[in-house]
């Protein structure tokens, strides 16, 4: 049981360290791409940005001593450019970005010292369930934006492909958390599909840069 719970806690937190940051950034992309007059869409995007920032902060707080060394050193959680990019984005957009979260991530330690701590398991489960709730709303929001943009009823500087792109990432995050909550782990059969998914995502990143 301890090994299964350790895997559940570690995989959940490693997933959150990567994806909550991405979801916060996606909400930021949506927010900055709407015209000033679209206050409803802008306010909703900003709400999601703030909520996922809180979720990221919670994940970082729980992750110390609970995640793998490979993940912390992979560049998936942060890079040498992350803090500087956040500072510049905050300066240019005037949107509050809590840089202290990245600073805390740099101090994270690897390991799993308290895998039998029921309180930790409960906290991770609550975080998973809260993020699933947020993802349901964010996915619906992105789907509505995509529908309105493709119907020429809403202006945004984001290309439809970018909106589809960040929608797929949110759905993958939701799928991973759902499987963790239902099974306690990620089935190995999904590894091939994950590789294919990220190959497509990276190709689209290259298209956006071009």
Annotate the PLM regions.
Residues 2-210:
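Surface-exposed peri-terminal alpha-helical interaction modules
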């Amino acid at each position: 049981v301890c090994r299964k719970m350790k895997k559940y806690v570690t995989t959940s937190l490693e997933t959150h360290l990567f994806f909550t940051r991405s979801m916060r950034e996606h909400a930021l992309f949506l927010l900055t791409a709407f015209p000033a007059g679209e206050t409803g869409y802008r306010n909703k995007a900003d709400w999601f940005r703030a909520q996922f920032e809180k979720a990221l902060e919670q994940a970082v707080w729980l992750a110390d001593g609970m995640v793998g060394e490979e993940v912390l050193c992979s560049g998936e959680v942060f890079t040498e450019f992350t803090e500087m990019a956040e500072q510049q984005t905050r300066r240019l957009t005037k949107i509050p970005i809590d840089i202290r979260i990245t600073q805390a991530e740099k101090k994270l330690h690897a390991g799993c010292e308290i895998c039998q701590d029921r309180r930790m398991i409960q906290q991770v489960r609550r975080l998973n369930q809260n993020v699933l709730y947020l993802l349901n709303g964010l996915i619906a929001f992105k789907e509505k934006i995509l529908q309105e943009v493709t119907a020429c009823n809403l202006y945004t500087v984001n290309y439809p492909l970018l909106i589809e792109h960040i929608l797929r990432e949110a759905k993958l995050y939701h799928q991973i958390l759902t499987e963790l909550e239902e099974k306690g782990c990620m089935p190995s059969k999904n590894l091939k599909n994950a590789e294919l998914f990220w190959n497509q995502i990276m190709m689209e990143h290259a298209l956006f840069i071009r």
